[in-house]
Amino acid sequence: MSQEDAFYGKGSYGASSGNSNIPPQGFQPVYPVAGQLDNTAPYVGAVAEGTAEGIVSNGEYAVGAMGAAPTNIIGSVDQQPPVSHTSHKSRRQYPAEVFELTNTLAASPAPPSLSEPSYVMARTPSSSPYPHDRAEVGTKSLSAQFGGMSLGADGAAAMPTNELVSVDLYNQTPEISDLTSPPPPINLPLSYSATGAATSNCPPKYVRSTINCVPTTNSLLKKSKIPFALVIRPYTSLVEEDDPVPVVTDTIISRCRRCRMYINPFSIFIDNGHRYRCNSCGIVNEVPQSYDWDSFRNVQRDRWQRPELNYAVVDFIAPQEYMVRAPQPLVYVFLIDISFVSISSGMVGTASRAILESLDRIPNKEGRAKVAFIGVDSALHFFSVSPGAEEATQLVVSDLEEPFLPRNQDLLLNLRECRQGIENLLERFQSMFATTRDSSNALGPGLKAAHRLIENIGGKICCLISSLPNVGVGKLELREDPKLLGTNRESSLLHPNDSFYKSFAVECSTSQVSVDMFLFSSQYQDVATLSCLPRYTSGKTQFYHRWNASRSEDALKFASELTNYLSMEIELEAVMRVRGSNGLRMSSFYGNFFNRSSDLCAFPSFPRDQSYVVEVVIEDTITKPFVSFQTAMLHTTCNGERRIRVLTISLPTTNSMTDLYASADQVAIAQYLTVRASEKALSSTLNEARDSIISKLVEILEVYKKNLAGQNTGAAIPLQISTNLRLLPLLCLALTKHTGFRRSSHISSDLRSIALCYLSTLPTPLLMRYIYPTLYSLHDMPIEAGTVTEQGVVLPSALNLTSALLQSFGLYLVDTHIHQFLYIGKDAVPQLLIDAFGVNSLADLKAGRFTMPVIDNPLNVRINAILGKLRSLDKGSTIMPSLYLVRGDGDPQLRSWFFSHFVEDRSENSPSYLQFLQTLKEKVRD
């Protein structure tokens, strides 16, 4: 048995090492191996008696308990044998469903009776050394609510801490369930919050910190080599009703007069409640006079029921002084490429039908939404519809040097008043240009015209492009050179090729205009240049490689994603600022937006399917037991209401390297390294991007070995790290093997550029799946997998991404969030093919883009349920993953693409995981 086989337990995952035809013990065989008797098959459809331990995985994150006992203790390498994966000889483990942790203090008054958020933090147990009786809050003197609490450094020393437990990476199989496990808990006593509510601290699905215990000095942070950053995701669903947060409706907003932080659960009330001390800068502020008065019912209100004192995530309805101008309507300008390439590929017809079918999904509660349509080829084609008219008038502007609006009105169409004319236009849009032979694409002039149309009110420009812009301002050249791919000069292909797009993006941001790109490739599209527009205007880039409407899978994917895009509730005219306690400064910002100042991020429209990373610098020594960060986003909802979304997270402080490492969040660190490397790839070189990932990992391992690792025993020298960071090396390796960073001469610049777009913006759960895809074994999944319970569809347990675990007769699913792959082994038997796909042989299955058939068979039903469940997990994304069928005896290129996701294997120019660990081991030697 090879070293790799032993590491991953080969023989227990695949067929027995002695005889590949011996069935796994404890399973009832269902599918016979070709050429073997039925009772010797290693395919299973049932598990041994009893239910499998664990339950459904739904992609949610549990929240670390404030003041609760540490939950991330696993045991040391000396106390615990190496982790091994569940074999076919025992029942599989399922990732646990996250249950809401409810209030355990029955005597405590409940938070406001609002729509309960999906996050609820555990309360301090009664045995905690930090007594807390919330019933006293409001009945005793307000100045006594924090009685006995020290705000000095001594107070921090008494807090519970996470235990540091070391593991030897080289002797432990990566425990990939950690990717969906909660981060190390934030050990902050509930008594530090004003009301003691379990929802006082921000849950990780909104804000994650790379360290959940903040060093008191910059020297300690530098010495630790752990990056300090926040991962922020203000919205977790495409529509608010899917994940509502409490709303402060009385427009009474109290903010610190010095640092401007909003009052929050960690504000400290003094002077009998007339004033409060800011938990960020420490200055004393007056409480608004009407803070305890319900102006709607004209009665006294209970202060301790106010949402902003009980919930870390709230929306404030903004008063008039927060408005520069009246709320503007939601506006979409569809800029459509109507060149010969677009018409012949079917893009124009598919897009017009998708828009038509999505008109009722566009947020338009107040009836103010507006749309416009501009076609571009060698001229600009405008479409005018008068209110109540049934037909549109086409107006053509051929002057591309100085494009102008042919009419002052009726180009921007009220969706409700002009509905019939809009529908008729979209129904015949494809046929209007069916005979075109024009191959020109005047994207630049079209963008300028669209901007001029909406510059006074703002909105979104949705570009649907199938060919390279080749006339007018912003025209691009075909610069793809296969000889540069995989070389040091490849980075030049990832940099913008025309300054027009970045300068135009800045102009759009100033006038509250956002640009989104839907790019369809039949050839080179220069994604690197065109993605500049969404990057600086808070937009998004979607790329459809080799798209053609004649493939139903292609048409369905685009139509679904465009529908999701138009259905998404977006926030308009938004600005976001992240504030921190004294001594902390936000230094760098990553994501799609424009920096108006050093710490103010501007979003003409705020998408709900992206996340942002903010790097933090410690400038002064911190003397308080905890620090606070607050993200505030001022915006206008798509229904015309001005609001401020506020997210507050407080973290304990420490002067201990041990506490720092025990509280580090490997997932947040991986996301920080990802966005920083993506930035380097776009501004510098791919080599520097890859080096930045590995060098930071080596620094962390070196510090751990020097300061925290146990004494080496025996002849073998371990490669140690704490349990909460044990997946960081694997994630770093996966990053360097990702399409965005992998050294390869077979990755086009367009594919690499779109990968960098996704790596820079995907929310944390989806990013982890994109970096380290999820692998499921479907031919031998337990009987519970794919069935529906009260918690939803049960998913099989995930496997490590190594081909050592694949069987030649198996059926597997790989999910990257962007793509899904069904892999059927070359030795698959007819019964498996019949049950899964309704065919008798592999030859009857066409590899490539694939639609899973729906047949009356239990296995097929379960597989379809699993595919649907995985797509439903992405409720905060507009992306519908493409499904591919890969045959073990099929197209070598398709197989190569599939196996490129197996990041623990050795691949082109890249080591296996074990080889990578050996390299790290050599780098961190004294």
UniProtKB/Swiss-Prot annotation:
This is Protein transport protein sec24. GO terms for molecular function: SNARE binding; zinc ion binding. It comes from Schizosaccharomyces pombe (strain 972 / ATCC 24843) (Fission yeast). Zn(2+) binds at residues 256, 259, 278, 281. InterPro entries: ADF-H/Gelsolin-like_dom_sf, Gelsolin-like_dom, Gelsolin-like_dom_sf, Sec23/24_helical_dom, Sec23/24_helical_dom_sf, Sec23/24_trunk_dom, Sec23_24_beta_S, SEC23_SEC24_subfamily. One of its GO terms (cellular component) is endoplasmic reticulum exit site. Residues 1-21, 73-93, 107-134 are annotated as: Disordered. The keyword Zinc-finger does not apply. The COPII coat is composed of at least 5 proteins: the SEC23/24 complex, the SEC13/31 complex, and the protein SAR1. It is a peripheral membrane protein. Component of the coat protein complex II (COPII) which promotes the formation of transport vesicles from the endoplasmic reticulum (ER). The coat has two main functions, the physical deformation of the endoplasmic reticulum membrane into vesicles and the selection of cargo molecules. It comes from the Eukaryota. SUPFAM superfamilies: beta-sandwich domain of Sec23/24, C-terminal, gelsolin-like domain of Sec23/24, Helical domain of Sec23/24, vWA-like, Zn-finger domain of Sec23/24. Keywords: Cytoplasm, Cytoplasmic vesicle, Endoplasmic reticulum, ER-Golgi transport, Golgi apparatus, Membrane, Metal-binding, Protein transport, Transport, Zinc. It is found in: Cytoplasm; Cytoplasmic vesicle, COPII-coated vesicle membrane; Endoplasmic reticulum membrane; Golgi apparatus membrane. It holds the Pfam family zf-Sec23_Sec24. Belongs to the SEC23/SEC24 family. SEC24 subfamily. The lineage of its organism: Eukaryota, Fungi, Dikarya, Ascomycota, Taphrinomycotina. Residues 73-85 have a biased composition (Polar residues). Residues 255-281 are annotated as: Zinc finger-like. GO terms for biological process: COPII-coated vesicle cargo loading; intracellular protein transport.
